[in-house]
């Protein structure tokens, strides 16, 4: 058993999964659960029976028209060309903000309609989170944004101005041996609470990499 108490993006849990461990991945940040739920639990794409398959669902989301929603109103400037960093928030270009809103709203609609289950929703949220991070006007931390597109040197301008585009997730790669295909479980709780829940059994590796 590999217990990852602060899983974050899940890179260490994925490596453990690939090496045959049963994985317990935890992080109290909801984004981590969204990233890791499907990627760790599945060895192939979920069925997406109601939507005609995973790739068709991704293609549909990429073709959606732009929508002004929460991200556009709260994380984008009023105008990409004329803005005031003391008043406007410059996390995303407006076009990408509207794409994020459109895609997230459609995923929520599918969930409300019962067209996707929790694992399938995770398989859609993960590429949205990754692609949104790629086009963000930040240096990787969302506590602040560059005061101007790309920062002082504008070295990241090409990335920030690129079109947000979803690519399918890659799921856990495990060996053919059934013993190499252990289950994985995801938690979204305080690390101490998880440790208390696990007090009745031992783990092979307890990985703690707190923020």
Locations of regions flagged by a protein language model:
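SAM-dependent nucleic-acid methyltransferase catalytic core
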Residues: 11, 83-211
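Short, surface-exposed, charged/polar-biased interaction segments
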Residues: 23, 37, 44, 57, ...
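Conserved phosphoryl-transfer catalytic core
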Residues: 31, 36-99, 106
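Conserved S-adenosyl-L-methionine
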Residues: 1-53
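Phosphate-binding glycine-rich loops and adjacent basic patches that engage nucleotide phosphates
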Residues: 1-2, 15-21, 58-67, 83-87, ...
């Amino acid at each position: 058993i590999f217990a990852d108490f602060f899983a974050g993006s899940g890179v260490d849990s994925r490596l453990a999964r690939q090496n045959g461990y049963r994985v317990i991945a935890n992080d109290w940040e909801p984004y981590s659960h969204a990233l890791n739920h499907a990627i760790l639990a599945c060895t192939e794409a979920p069925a997406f029976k109601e939507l005609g398959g995973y790739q068709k669902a991704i293609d549909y989301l990429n073709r959606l028209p732009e929508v002004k929603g929460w991200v556009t109103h709260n994380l984008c400037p009023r105008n990409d060309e004329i803005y005031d960093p003391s008043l406007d928030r410059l996390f995303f270009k407006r076009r990408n903000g509207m794409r994020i809103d459109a895609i997230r709203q459609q995923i929520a609609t599918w969930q409300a309609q019962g067209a996707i289950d929790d694992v399938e929703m995770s398989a859609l949220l993960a590429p949205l989170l990754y692609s949104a991070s790629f086009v963000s006007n930040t240096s990787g931390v969302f506590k602040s944004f560059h005061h101007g597109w790309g920062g002082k040197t504008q070295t990241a301008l090409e990335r920030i101005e690129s079109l947000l585009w979803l690519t399918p997730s890659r799921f856990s790669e495990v060996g053919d041996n059934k013993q190499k295909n252990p289950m994985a479980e995801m938690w979204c709780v305080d690390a101490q609470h998880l440790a208390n829940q696990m007090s009745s059994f031992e783990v092979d590796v307890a990985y703690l990499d707190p923020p």
